[in-house]
Design a protein with these regions (language model features):
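N-terminal leader/signal peptides at the extreme start of proteins
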Residues: 1-11
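Conserved beta-strand segments that form the floor/walls of ligand-binding pockets within enzyme
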Residues: 5, 19, 130
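Residue-level signal for short amphipathic helical patches enriched in basic/charged
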Residues: 8, 34, 57
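Alpha-helical hydrophobic helix detector
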Residues: 12-32
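Transmembrane signal-anchor/signal-peptide helices with a preference for the extracytoplasmic
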Residues: 32-38
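Short, conserved structural patches
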Residues: 40, 45-162
Length: 162
């Protein structure tokens, strides 16, 4: 019995067998966290691009009274896909609905505007683009994460009418 207790052969294999599950959890958890932050970065970049696109549209595309834009569908497409084409693939997997992107317009009438905004009686229009997309988990099929996790972002741009 003493020889069996003092025998150290196989100790490293036993330690490895105990550590592998923990190492796998850490490794795949790191993959999932990295993918989440990458997806979050993509939606932040998408709303910035959508707001930037909206800011370059002419002043006539915006109605300050109703807070809407006649070009809302194009702005939503640019935000969701990166281009105005409706057949382009989405930037985030499963982000297929333009209803997930909202476009709103506010006009600053409290300030006296000059420059390119001088002729606008309703003030300088500011476009806000907001978006929400469901997070496409790397390991969602395994049932490890809730399927209702969303990523969201918003961005604003002053309409330059260029």
């Amino acid at each position: 019995v003493r020889a069996f207790i003092r025998d150290r052969s196989g100790a490293a294999a036993a330690e490895m067998a105990l550590m592998v599950p923990l190492l796998m959890i850490l490794m795949f958890g790191g993959f999932e966290a990295g993918h989440y932050f990458y997806t979050e970065h993509k939606i932040v970049k998408a709303v910035r691009d959508g707001a930037r696109y909206a800011g370059r549209l002419p002043f006539s595309a915006y109605d300050c009274g109703s807070g809407t834009s006649s070009q809302a569908a194009l702005i939503q497409n640019v935000t969701r896909t990166g281009v105005a084409d409706t057949t382009a693939p989405p930037l985030i997997y499963n982000w297929t609905d333009n209803a997930d992107v909202t476009v709103s317009v506010t006009c600053n009438t409290a300030e006296t505007t000059k420059g390119i905004f001088t002729d606008l009686a309703s003030g300088a229009p500011v476009v806000t683009v907001s978006a929400t997309a469901s997070y496409p988990s790397l390991f969602g099929a395994l049932g490890l994460l809730d399927a209702d996790i969303n990523v969201a972002a918003n961005a604003q741009a002053v309409v330059n009418g260029l």
